[in-house]
Amino acid sequence: MRLPIFLDTDPGIDDAVAIAAAIFAPELDLQLMTTVAGNVSVEKTTRNALQLLHFWNVDIPLAQGAAVPLVRAPRDAASVHGESGMAGYDFVEHNRQPLGIPAFLAIRDALMRAPEPVTLVAIGPLTNIALLLSQCPECKPYIRRLVIMGGSAGRGNCTPNAEFNIAADPEAAACVFRSGIEIVMCGLDVTNQAILTPDYLATLPELNRTGKMLHALFSHYRSGSMQSGLRMHDLCAIAWLVRPELFTLKPCFVAVETQGEFTSGTTVVDIDGCLGKPANVQVALDLDVKGFQQWVAEVLALAL
């Protein structure tokens, strides 16, 4: 039985790898994609997502989502992904268009139509998910769980303590973590370990057309290097769905700092239970790196 999932994303080069895995992993049934502003503007993330769907010739509905965070000015990660978000490969022109409704409403409608609760996967800022939970609370029983790439129990990657997806919209993340839905958090504690080695990266052009495309994108990706290895942050959320045994999780109380001058966007992960609050998030703290790398090689070999 394939696991039905909806994927909220902000492509983004490592998003492209995660999308490939979500499409081609035989255990998963990707039924809906939504985009959000994050790595680049939502217009660019939508264009990039549609280009990928056309590249793989798959008919998965896609809805464009939030262009700005809930309350603050947008920030991006163009320094990591390039100005377009997916520079390095010349995609074929197409005439695909997103659905005519906002992402959070598309998620709501699809949840309400689904015969069973659906797993949501969010690998960008959590703006769309916060809008869904705040504007459509009736949807909560139809969400099996939310798996996110975001946060950290330790250091950050865009400030000393904050990870980009959370820092891009801290108020949205705070809303989601307070919501009461089941959450699995794949943060920097594991994603910084999720490295594709130079030896493997060198094999991609001969793997298949997806390998050629990803290799071209990776030459513009700044989360590591082709010589030292590349971190596959977003792919961890997909990997957990398929191979949860590769991850060490701990239930923790997690809150998001929204006020601090230097700490805004920090995920406060109470690993030792100091606050005495009930756990609201399953936090991934360690990764079987060899197992992860083997799984990536297996799933990308299935891509077209």
Curated annotation (Swiss-Prot):
Keywords: Glycosidase, Hydrolase. GO terms for cellular component: cytosol. CDD domains: nuc_hydro_IU_UC_XIUA (cd02651). Pfam families: IU_nuc_hydro. InterPro entries: I/U_nuclsd_hydro_CS, Inosine/uridine_hydrolase_dom, IUNH, Nucleosid_hydro_RihC_nonspecif, Ribo_hydro-like. The keyword Hydrolase applies. The active site is at H233. One of its GO terms (biological process) is purine nucleoside catabolic process. GO terms for molecular function: purine nucleosidase activity; uridine nucleosidase activity. Signal peptide: none annotated. It comes from the Bacteria. Its EC number is 3.2.-.-. Hydrolyzes both purine and pyrimidine ribonucleosides with a broad-substrate specificity. Belongs to the IUNH family. RihC subfamily. This is Non-specific ribonucleoside hydrolase RihC.
